[in-house]
């Protein structure tokens, strides 16, 4: 097994669109959501996901969606990301029920929650990501005639820089409680950038605010993923994406950071916990995947 070269395809000022580098991973996850939507008994249906794949023209993902698998192995990653999607959906639903009317989706990518969820009246959903990614999403959804179910505000910004000023300039109210999601981002940040991200979120979060985070206790090791595909032939993880080269070594624990900076952190769960909570019995392949990814699903409040 070769030593993974974490972050070897990254630089401090790298940029991307939806079909390159880190941007492609958002497209890949949209593909998994689309596959989950057509699987038996899906936890959530994101019917916009397949639209993004079609618009991208990506041959790998369009091919997979044209012939979706049905075995436990083939549905492994769609199943795991179905659970993750449901986790964040439930988080925002609960925040809205508690009276929070500002939602901030960090690294929004191809997230369609502004269009899918039933938001309370007067809710604003801020989507923060690179301009090229937001432009692709807006174009595709606009061509579909999709209408958001809340006031949707795009904030074009690099999350490694000071994105708090553009967010406030877009109308974010620092005096009102907010609900934050950080989904699928942390592996692509250095430890320093992760600290800066949470520091900015904390500085913008009024009392009553909430946060939900999806994190990994290990980085996505390309060799481990390849070995998984060999031991479970139906698993097709990545379309040959080298996640090791796009991600960084794990250092800080997000739950520990939040607890040390004024947040009350709920018990941390993993993907298997989420599945059990949704009445599912995780098959062997799911247990194996979470064994090396060491997923963390974190919620906290101020």
From Swiss-Prot:
One of its GO terms (biological process) is methylation. Its EC number is 2.1.1.-. It holds the Pfam family LCM. The keyword Methyltransferase applies. S-adenosyl-L-methionine binds at residues 129, 158-159. Keywords: Methyltransferase, S-adenosyl-L-methionine, Transferase. Gene3D superfamilies: Vaccinia Virus protein VP39. It is an enzyme of class 2 (transferase). GO terms for molecular function: methyltransferase activity. InterPro entries: Ppm1/Ppm2/Tcmp, SAM-dependent_MTases_sf, SAM_mthyl_Trfase_ML2640-like. The keyword Metal-binding does not apply. Signal peptide: none annotated. Exhibits S-adenosyl-L-methionine-dependent methyltransferase activity. Belongs to the UPF0677 family. PANTHER family: S-ADENOSYL-L-METHIONINE-DEPENDENT METHYLTRANSFERASE YKTD-RELATED (PTHR43619), S-ADENOSYL-L-METHIONINE-DEPENDENT METHYLTRANSFERASES SUPERFAMILY PROTEIN (PTHR43619:SF2). This is Putative S-adenosyl-L-methionine-dependent methyltransferase MAP_1622c. It comes from Mycolicibacterium paratuberculosis (strain ATCC BAA-968 / K-10) (Mycobacterium paratuberculosis). The lineage of its organism: Bacteria, Bacillati, Actinomycetota, Actinomycetes, Mycobacteriales.
């Amino acid at each position: 097994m070769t030593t993974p070269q974490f972050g070897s395809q990254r630089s401090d000022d790298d940029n991307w669109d939806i079909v390159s580098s880190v941007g492609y991973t958002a497209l890949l996850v949209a593909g998994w959501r689309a596959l989950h939507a057509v699987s038996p008994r899906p936890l959530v249906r994101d019917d916009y996901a397949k639209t993004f794949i079609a618009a991208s023209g990506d041959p790998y993902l369009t091919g997979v969606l044209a012939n979706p698998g049905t075995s436990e192995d083939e549905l492994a990653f769609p199943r795991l990301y179905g659970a993750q999607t449901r986790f964040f959906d439930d988080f925002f639903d609960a925040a809205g029920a508690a009276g929070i009317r500002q939602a901030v989706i960090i690294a929004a990518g191809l997230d369609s929650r502004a269009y899918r969820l039933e938001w309370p009246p007067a809710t604003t959903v801020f989507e923060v990501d690179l301009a090229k990614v937001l432009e692709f999403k807006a174009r595709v959804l606009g061509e579909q005639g999709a209408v958001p179910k809340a006031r949707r505000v795009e904030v074009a910004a690099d999350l490694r820089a000071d994105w708090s000023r553009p967010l406030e300039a877009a109308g974010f109210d620092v005096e009102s409680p907010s609900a934050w999601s950080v989904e699928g981002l942390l592996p692509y940040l250095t430890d320093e950038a992760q600290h800066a991200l949470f520091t900015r979120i904390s500085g913008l979060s009024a009392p009553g605010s909430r946060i939900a985070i999806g994190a990994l206790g290990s980085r996505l090791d390309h060799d481990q993923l390849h070995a998984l595909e060999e031991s479970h032939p139906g698993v097709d993880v990545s379309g040959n994406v080298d996640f090791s080269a796009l991600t960084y070594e794990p250092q800080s624990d997000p739950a520990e950071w939040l607890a040390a900076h004024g947040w009350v952190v709920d018990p941390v769960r993993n993907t298997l916990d989420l599945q059990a909570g949704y009445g599912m019995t995780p098959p062997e392949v799911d247990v194996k995947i979470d064994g090396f990814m060491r997923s963390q699903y974190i919620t906290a409040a101020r």
